[in-house]
């Protein structure tokens, strides 16, 4: 029979892995945004400053979901609040 602590740790590891899946979306989105930004600068080099600042702001906003997933994974693995409930 598995102990309660082992079960919580196992489920926390699975949850941390699932939380890290949140990093896939921002990575793909940022790659697409960078590609389109480079294409836009190639078409209109005079608007480089506006294009780059807008692209970087959009990438920063998109990255927050990945960072939240990373924070949840770190909390589940190293500062597990569920272990205190046993």
From Swiss-Prot:
Record's bilayer topology term: Multi-pass membrane protein
Short name of one Pfam family: ATP-synt_C
Residue ranges of coiled coil: none
Site positions (Reversibly protonated during proton transport): 63
Residue ranges crossing the lipid bilayer per the database entry: 8-28, 64-84
Molecular function terms from GO: lipid binding; proton-transporting ATP synthase activity, rotational mechanism
UniProt keyword annotations, A-Z: ATP synthesis, Cell membrane, CF(0), Hydrogen ion transport, Ion transport, Lipid-binding, Membrane, Transmembrane, Transmembrane helix, Transport
Locations listed in the record: Cell membrane
Record-stated family: Belongs to the ATPase C chain family.
Name of the molecule in the record: ATP synthase subunit c
Organism, scientific name: Lachnoclostridium phytofermentans (strain ATCC 700394 / DSM 18823 / ISDg) (Clostridium phytofermentans)
Gene coding for it: atpE
């Amino acid at each position: 029979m598995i102990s309660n602590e082992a079960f919580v740790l196992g489920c926390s590891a699975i949850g941390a892995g699932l939380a890290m899946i949140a990093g896939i979306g921002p990575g793909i989105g940022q790659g697409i945004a960078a590609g389109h930004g480079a294409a836009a600068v190639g078409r209109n080099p005079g608007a480089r400053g506006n294009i780059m600042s807008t692209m970087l702001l959009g990438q920063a906003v998109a990255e927050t979901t990945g960072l939240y997933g990373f924070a949840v994974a770190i909390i589940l693995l190293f500062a597990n609040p569920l272990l205190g409930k046993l």
